[in-house]
Amino acid sequence: MSQQTPQESEQTTAKEQDLDQESVLSNIDFNTDLNHNLNLSEYCISSDAGTEKMDSDEEKSLANLPELKYAPKLSSLVKQETLTESLKRPHEDEKEAIDEAKKMKVPGENEDESKEEEKSQELEEAIDSKEKSTDARDEQGDEGDNEEENNEEDNENENEHTAPPALVMPSPIEMEEQRMTALKEITDIEYKFAQLRQKLYDNQLVRLQTELQMCLEGSHPELQVYYSKIAAIRDYKLHRAYQRQKYELSCINTETIATRTFIHQDFHKKVTDLRARLLNRTTQTWYDINKERRDMDIVIPDVNYHVPIKLDNKTLSCITGYASAAQLCYPGEPVAEDLACESIEYRYRANPVDKLEVIVDRMRLNNEISDLEGLRKYFHSFPGAPELNPLRDSEINDDFHQWAQ
């Protein structure tokens, strides 16, 4: 092909710019129509913790799909990169950035924007020239690889010699077709992925529903283990509670028996003590009554030895002044045996016995005995009853003291 003049190249670039603008408008209109017609949110499912658990099983399920079984592998579609291709990538990235900047522009911009477009076109032409030079070098080095590559390189070399330095862009119809096909493939992939994810969610939901039904029926193994542990703990606590109750009841029974025994023994002790006191009191009363009855039965008392006690103005010694009156003893001083045997309650510090009265009593007794002996000796009989002696003052006082007690 013949080389183009600079004017023709400028005209072609202007036409391409117009086509690019039309393609951008068509893209915008198509995107708006697509957004109205297709609602991709219906195929999207919110991700959760379940999606993180997709492992080798999901990969196997993806591999088993009929659509992907006969699909070509990615490694067969992608050519192995060479050093030159890796060097091309930065330039291609710059080119794509410029194209995107172009597409984002809308007709009707000001002159500054047109100047910026011209500058971007110049940069693209420089990048294309660099890429073509690197492609030519790489194609010359890789001629011996295979026949197809050689043919492609020859075609590219011819195109390089014949093609103008201006950027060759595909037609808008082809771009629309490519975009439509790509969009259709992407939507198909998204739809299949959504179906797969929904299937996985359904399987997981079925498994969870099955476990829930097993839990409701009580046949879940983990739930059975948990119930068995709870039952074991409950039985242990019940056993301890029963043992504690049994021990407390035994303690209460022992305490009750001990209390009843104590009350019974105390009752018997009180009854025994009361019986003993009543018997002692009754016996003492009985002896007192009998003694008084015997005393009342005695009309003439027996002649007993009497120890006279010194009494002021009553006994013989005190009356005649033979001896002074006796003085009372202090509490705790001992009592003479002759007084104790006579049950004399008068206690004196000095000798309380009236010796003069004792002598007189002995003289009287001796006189009575001599008289009786004379009667027996001379008269051989008792002429009459003897004269009875009256009560002494000491005996009267003793009787008064007993009545006062």
From Swiss-Prot:
Where does the UniProt entry say this protein principally localizes?
Answer: cytoplasm
Pfam families tied to this protein: Sds3 (PF08598)
Positions carrying Phosphoserine = 56, 120, 370
Cytoplasm among keywords? yes
Compositional bias of kind Basic and acidic residues: 86-108, 116-139
Residue ranges with Acidic residues bias? 140-157
Where is the protein found, in the record's own terms?
A: Cytoplasm; Nucleus
Which BP terms in the Gene Ontology apply to this protein? cellular response to heat; negative regulation of inositol biosynthetic process; negative regulation of phosphatidylcholine biosynthetic process; negative regulation of phosphatidylserine biosynthetic process; negative regulation of rDNA heterochromatin formation; negative regulation of silent mating-type cassette heterochromatin formation; negative regulation of transcription by RNA polymerase II; nucleosome assembly
Highest taxon, organism lineage: Eukaryota
Q: Where is this region: Disordered?
A: 1-26, 49-171
What keywords were assigned to this record? Chromatin regulator, Cytoplasm, Nucleus, Phosphoprotein, Repressor, Transcription, Transcription regulation
Bias (Low complexity): 1-12
Q: Which GO terms describe its molecular function?
A: histone deacetylase binding
Among the entry's GO cellular component annotations, what is one? Answer: Rpd3L-Expanded complex
Quaternary structure annotation from Swiss-Prot or TrEMBL: Component of the RPD3C(L) complex composed of at least ASH1, CTI6, DEP1, PHO23, RPD3, RXT2, RXT3, SAP30, SDS3, SIN3, UME1 and UME6.
Function in brief: Component of the RPD3C(L) histone deacetylase complex (HDAC) responsible for the deacetylation of lysine residues on the N-terminal part of the core histones (H2A, H2B, H3 and H4). Histone deacetylation gives a tag for epigenetic repression and plays an important role in transcriptional regulation, cell cycle progression and developmental events.
**This protein is called what?**
Transcriptional regulatory protein DEP1
* UniProt gene name: DEP1
